[in-house]
Amino acid sequence: EIHYSGEKGRAVMIGARVIALGIGYLFGLFQTGYLYGKSQGIDIRSEGSGNAGTTNSLRVLGIKAGLITFAGDLCKAILAVLLVKVLFRNAYPDAVKILELYAGFGAVLGHNFPFYLKFKGGKGIACTSGMILAVCPLAAPVCLILFIGSIAITRYVSLGSILVVTSYLVQVLIFGHMGYLHIDAAYLPEFYV
């Protein structure tokens, strides 16, 4: 366990956040839909809606491609969060949850803005779902019900996505207040943002 106080402590934690974000970004660079499309001779970013995510893969390449893209994009965020948890849990037990969040956010950034594809990736829905599952699994059931329910009723993935993010934020506030997030109180405001 590493304990630094004052400026050195803040600098170390900033460094840990940057490392976690970087790890997440690297995982997010794995563009499942783009790579699957390329294996089929198609650049998914020049077809359909033009993004490399699950919905466009499903529409352009079919159900198999959609499921593979969803699974890959979901898993890359989960793996990034789990790796950061393993790397930092002993050194920063009170801060590991915030570092997990940075890793998940980094994965979404890498997915949405991959540098090697001129920052043109997916929309981050499946990747965000993976982050939610890994960082705050308590929030996942309500998010899943809202997502599936809203799509079944309206056929709008974008509405489902908005409901998931809104629901996640509300649930994190509630779970944080109730102490279910297992995060040091000093990090709660940052976790909420």
Regions found by a protein language model. Give the residues of each.
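Loop-to-transmembrane alpha-helix initiation sites
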Residues: P141, V157-V165, D184-V193
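Membrane-helix interface "capping/anchor" motifs
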Residues: P114-K120, G149-T166
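Short, Lys/Arg-enriched N-terminal segments with co-localized hydrophobic residues
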Residues: E1-V12
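Membrane-interface helix termini and inter-helical loops of multi-pass transporters
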Residues: R89, H177-Y187
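Interfacial segments of multi-pass membrane proteins
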Residues: L58-I63, V84-F88, G124-T154, S167-G176
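Alpha-helical transmembrane segments in multi-pass membrane proteins
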Residues: A20, G24, L29, G33, ...
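Feature marks short, highly hydrophobic, charge-poor N-terminal signal-anchor/signal peptide-like helices
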Residues: M13-I19
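Cytosolic, membrane-interface loops and tails of multi-pass inner-membrane proteins
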Residues: Y34-K64, G121
